[in-house]
């Protein structure tokens, strides 16, 4: 069956295309067929670029026949979150405010993917303007392929759902406080927030200039590494872009993790955990130990303050960016999104400065923790996804339940505040019906995505969580 191509990894598809066992046109059509069949149920795509994709696929096949093979992404379909500008193709930002915007420029990321020979098949749904977790989009909620009554998190909700359902093999998400990693966690896929500055933000609609990141989302760690390889690197068009040399992310994947030290925080990251999450997390640490890693305790004293500080910084900067739109078209925003942005406009400058000072403290603490280990492992989400119809779904990605005290939707904001890379990958499923994905999150040192990818790949070689298929077919 042609659609079975959609369940192969990017590495496998790339080799089939390179050796001309299948054509880029065949692969593209397999994914477009699934999009047409399943997207009406999931609502992951906002725009489907059928004609564009077929034309690009034919061109890729012609180049490959002529011996002009561009690399492992040549002929591979992808669909980015609809915050990335695509020249001549609508970029809605998930909002009625900009639903008719057709950019006259290209984001650096999509430009680099075009140069690598990847094929754009559409643009993916998201929380309006990437404003956080939940289900609020100007184009309707994205449903979770593992259970349509549950959220797909946010704000890169379409990306997580589309990869899980194999509507696309690759996506680009954005992440200000967990918006790549949350959707990856609840969809059973892989999401990487790179080091701040590693991937260009030119042509990406901002939410928070000092916290925004863009990065790969995929079905496997190896696929994420292939995608990162294509998009990483300095960009003079982005003032936040870093100049560090981009290493080979793919070659070291098979080196194993013998001798690596994995830090496990002694507090703040596991409070209020659902029992199934705790069990999966402990089993994940056991697998890493079996593979040769050493588990060591670490402490990040003020980690519990990361989410409130991150929210204050992010929404203050977002309110500044959207100030004119709010003044001119307030009725086009979702009411809850508008409320958050308008409220943030009244935050005190002194509070913003305090949050930035806390950010400096967290950076020192995270760097000190990573001085004693190679990476840190925490649960991606302490609890399970929220139901779409639940009261908390519009404000948070997960069921609040009996979680104590000030509830943290995830353990993600600290990586945005400090700029360290963070990788999320599946590590189990809940015991209820339907079984829902559970994920682990790995933090690394600045510009050391390679170690995170290496550990994640080793874990996936030893487990099969990433091979499970959601019940959408």
Segments the model singles out, each with a brief description of its role:
Residues 12-19, 97-101, 212-219, 342-347, ...:
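Short, well-ordered beta-strand elements within core beta-sheets of diverse protein domains
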Residues 73-214, 239, 265-267, 315, ...:
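Short glycine/serine-rich loop/turn segments
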Residues 43, 169, 374:
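Conserved acidic residues
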Residues 51-61, 117-118:
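Long amphipathic alpha-helix in the N-terminal Rossmann-like dinucleotide-binding domain
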Residues 21-29, 58, 248, 275-299, ...:
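Acyltransferase
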Residues 1-54, 290-292, 468-473:
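An N-terminal boundary/leader segment
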Residues 73-93, 251-266, 313-367, 379-383, ...:
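Short helix-loop capping/hinge segments that flank enzyme active sites or metal/cofactor-binding pockets
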Residues 37, 111, 115, 164-271, ...:
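Structural helix-boundary/capping segments
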């Amino acid at each position: 069956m042609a659609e079975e191509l959609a369940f192969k990894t990017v590495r496998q598809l790339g080799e089939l295309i390179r050796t001309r066992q299948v054509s880029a046109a065949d692969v593209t059509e397999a994914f477009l067929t699934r999009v047409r069949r399943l997207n009406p149920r999931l609502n992951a795509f906002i725009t489907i670029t059928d004609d564009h994709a077929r034309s690009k696929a034919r061109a890729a096949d012609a180049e490959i026949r002529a011996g002009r093979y561009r690399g492992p992404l040549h002929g591979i379909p992808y669909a980015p979150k609809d915050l990335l500008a695509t020249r001549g193709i609508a970029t809605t930002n998930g909002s009625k405010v900009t639903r008719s915007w057709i950019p006259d420029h290209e984001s650096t990321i999509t430009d680099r993917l075009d140069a690598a020979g990847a094929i754009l098949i559409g643009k993916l749904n998201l929380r309006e303007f990437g404003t956080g977790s939940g289900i609020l989009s100007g184009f309707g909620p994205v449903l979770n392929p593992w259970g349509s009554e549950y959220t797909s998190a946010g704000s890169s909700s379409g990306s997580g759902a589309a990869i899980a359902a194999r509507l696309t093999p690759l996506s680009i998400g954005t992440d200000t406080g967990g918006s790549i990693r949350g959707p990856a966690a609840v969809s059973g896929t892989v999401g990487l927030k790179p080091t701040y500055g590693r991937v260009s933000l030119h042509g990406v609609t901002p939410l928070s200039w000092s916290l925004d990141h863009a990065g790969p989302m995929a079905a496997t760690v190896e696929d994420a590494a292939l995608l990162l390889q294509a998009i990483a690197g300095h960009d003079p068009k982005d003032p936040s872009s870093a100049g560090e040399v981009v290493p080979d992310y793919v070659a070291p994947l098979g080196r194993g993790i013998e001798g690596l030290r994995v830090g496990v925080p002694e507090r703040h990251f596991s409070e209020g955990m659902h029992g199934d999450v705790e069990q999966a997390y402990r089993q994940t640490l056991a697998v890493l130990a079996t593979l040769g890693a050493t588990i060591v305790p670490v402490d990040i004293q003020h980690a519990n303050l990361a989410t409130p500080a991150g929210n204050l910084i992010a929404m203050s900067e977002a309110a500044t960016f959207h100030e004119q739109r709010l003044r001119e078209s307030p009725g086009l925003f979702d009411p809850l999104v508008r409320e958050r942005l308008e409220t943030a406009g009244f935050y005190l400058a002194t509070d913003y400065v305090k949050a930035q000072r806390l950010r400096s403290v967290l950076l020192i603490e995270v760097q000190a923790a990573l001085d004693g280990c190679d990476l840190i492992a925490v649960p991606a989400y302490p609890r399970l996804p929220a139901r779409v119809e639940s009261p908390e779904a519009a404000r948070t990605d997960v069921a609040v339940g009996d979680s104590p005290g000030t509830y943290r939707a995830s353990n993600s904001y600290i990586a945005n505040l400090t700029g360290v890379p963070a990788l999320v990958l599946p590590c189990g499923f809940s015991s209820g019906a339907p079984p829902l994905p559970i994920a682990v999150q790995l933090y690394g040192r600045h510009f050391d995505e390679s170690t995170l990818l290496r550990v994640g790949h080793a874990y996936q070689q030893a487990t099969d969580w990433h091979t499970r298929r959601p019940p959408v077919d």
